[in-house]
C-alpha cells in the first residue's frame, strides 16, 4: 500500500492522509489517525468514510486552520478530471458539511490539486496542469476576494400584511461585527 499527502488538524491531534490500503471505497481514499498522548505511533488508520471518499481517487488533503477540509478527487462530477473539493468543518471530531467543488478559476477542465492556504488568510497555492502553464504541473497562487452582500428587506405584520415602521433589527456576522437597522414607514430596512 502507498501512503502520502499528510495534513494535520488545526489542533495537531488528527493526521489525515491518502492511501490505497485495503478497506477503502476506491483507488485512493482519505484516512486518518488520532494522536494518543501527543503521538501517532501505534494509531490504527481509519477511513474518513463515504461522505468524503468516492469510488475514484481522493488525494491531496489540506486541513485549513479554520477546520475546513480540502482535497482533490476524480470521483465526483466537476470541471475536470481531478478537482479540488471542500467540506466545511463542523463542531465535533471529524464532522464536516456536505462537500462542494471549488468554482472556476480554482478548478479548471484540467487536473487541479494540492491546495494549501496561508494560516489566517484567504490566500494560498495549488497545483494544476491547465493550459498556459510553464510545465506539466505548475504552482498557482490565489487570493480570494472578500464576500460582499447586497440585500433589501421589508418587515410586515404577519396578520395584517401592513408594513411595520420603527422596527430595529440587528444583522450579526460570523466575525462578531454587527449592523443595526430600523424600518422606515414602508417597512424597509434603512
What are these regions (language model features)?
Residues 1-154, 158-171, 179-186:
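Short, conserved micro-motifs composed of acidic
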Amino acid at each position: 500500500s502507498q501512503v502520502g499527502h499528510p495534513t494535520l488538524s488545526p489542533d495537531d491531534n488528527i493526521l489525515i492522509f491518502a492511501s490505497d490500503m485495503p478497506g477503502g471505497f476506491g483507488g485512493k481514499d482519505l484516512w486518518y489517525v488520532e494522536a494518543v498522548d501527543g503521538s501517532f505511533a501505534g494509531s490504527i488508520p481509519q477511513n474518513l468514510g463515504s461522505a468524503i471518499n468516492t469510488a475514484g481517487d481522493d488525494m491531496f488533503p489540506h486541513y485549513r486552520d479554520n477546520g475546513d477540509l480540502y482535497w482533490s478527487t476524480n470521483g465526483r462530477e466537476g470541471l475536470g478530471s481531478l478537482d479540488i473539493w471542500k467540506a466545511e468543518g463542523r463542531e465535533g471530531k471529524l464532522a464536516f458539511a456536505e462537500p462542494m467543488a471549488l468554482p472556476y478559476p480554482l478548478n479548471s477542465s484540467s487536473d487541479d490539486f494540492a491546495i494549501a492556504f496561508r494560516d489566517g488568510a484567504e490566500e494560498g497555492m495549488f497545483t494544476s496542469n491547465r493550459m498556459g502553464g510553464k510545465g506539466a504541473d505548475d504552482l498557482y497562487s490565489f487570493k480570494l476576494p472578500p464576500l460582499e452582500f447586497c440585500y433589501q428587506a421589508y418587515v410586515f405584520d404577519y396578520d395584517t400584511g401592513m408594513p411595520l415602521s420603527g422596527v430595529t433589527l440587528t444583522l450579526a456576522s460570523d466575525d462578531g461585527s454587527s449592523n443595526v437597522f430600523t424600518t422606515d414607514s414602508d417597512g424597509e430596512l434603512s
